[in-house]
Amino acid sequence: VSACLFPHFHKPFPYNQNSTWIKPCYVDDVEIGNNSIYIDWIFDDLYQYYEAEGVSKEDFLRAFGQQATEYYLLKNTPDYVDYIGCVTYRRMLCFRPEIPVYENQINMPASEAVKLGTEEELKTLIHYMHFNEVITNRSTFLRGSVSQQYLESQPPEYWWLFHKAIQDLFPHYDKYSLHWFDESVIPFTTNYFFRKELFLRYASELFQILEYIYQNCSKVYPTKQPGDQFSEPLPWRYPGFIGERFLGFFINANKLNKLEVPLIFLQ
């Protein structure tokens, strides 16, 4: 039984280059170091929607963010692992045995971050995965609902297309599962470990949803315009925000056995 974590980096950041199970992923010209994976260009089927609006490949990758790593893993699924994990830039999941799982967030300087990824942590992770189908960071309790929180800052068009995509593409999710968006608890930041077969299903559904949005939205790469009634300064970042909400929905709708562990924020 083996596991591998694939952090997504868009800027250089130190990490444990001797870890056997952490393989940082990067695109473009970011230099990460040894034991990392450079994601070659494999995005033509998705980039076509951006290209039609004159968006450069560089801007596409900036908009895509961590989804580039998830897409790469979906298309190049490693056969040597049973559990697949993804984390976003400067964030990690805590598997240090000496740190209680009920901790919320741990701020860690770079001098400590380079020590993460030990064999002892891997053993702890695999032990957790024997009893759970997914691991995420600890959930956030919102003042309002998941839906309200999103719509307070983001353009609404992509949110409603997200809902419609779930209903049109995946009828096995009944209407009651959509009530999760009215709840107030969500594992923000899209950091997780899945059993491999569940990762493949999660990623496959996510990219079907994104493509549905691309095919039906008014603009694939929106920019902030005078008079827009949302506060988000970079609305083209919606793929990551949709992915963040879909993770929580996917876990809840499929009634997965979940363990929450502390989030490590790398300073």
Roles of regions detected by a PLM:
Residues 1-267:
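ER/Golgi luminal nucleotide-sugar-dependent glycosyltransferases, focusing on the catalytic module
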